[in-house]
Design a protein with these regions (language model features):
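Short, low-complexity, charge-dense intrinsically disordered segments
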Residues: 1-14, 141-142
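Nucleic-acid nuclease catalytic cores
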Residues: 88, 92-142
């Protein structure tokens, strides 16, 4: 019997997931220093400085291949960051997040073997973030 993927979201990180907690902490530091109002690329540039300071390994602008019947498609997604070699991190600078941005992260997770994703919005007075977990019933993590 095929397992149905479970999609769960959480607005808080805790000690059960120290990696996403560290990424959110770095994003909060960036937001504390820069505030809101900049373009997304400015926050990405700041993250390239902040992530190493927080001992967060990362790659920026990572191509995420998509396969169909084990054949690599010419179209691919591009994640803002992949941290700890397993967490997709997408930055936004929008007045408010919508289901479109959430779907973007979920599509990235679906196209890869990654099970965790973060959507972080810097354009509001308080930073906004949403954590996503993608996996089967036998592979849950919170």
């Amino acid at each position: 019997m095929t397992q149905i993927p479970q999609i769960r979201t959480s607005k808080s990180a805790d000690s059960r997931d120290p990696q996403t907690y560290a990424i959110i902490g770095a994003a909060m530091e960036i937001h504390r220093r820069l505030g809101c109002g900049f373009l997304e690329a400015v926050y990405q540039d700041a993250a390239e400085i902040e992530f190493p300071l927080q001992n967060i390994p990362f790659q920026r602008e990572v191509a995420l291949p998509i396969r169909y019947k084990d054949i690599l498609l010419p179209t691919h997604y591009r994640a803002d960051f992949v941290c700890f070699s397993e967490i997709i991190v997408e930055f936004k600078a929008l007045s408010q997040l919508t289901s479109i941005e959430e779907s973007q992260v979920l599509n990235y997770l679906k196209a890869t073997s990654f099970s965790r994703g973060l959507l972080i919005n810097f354009a509001t007075a308080s930073i906004q973030y949403k954590r996503f977990v993608w996996g089967s019933e036998t592979n849950k993590s919170v």
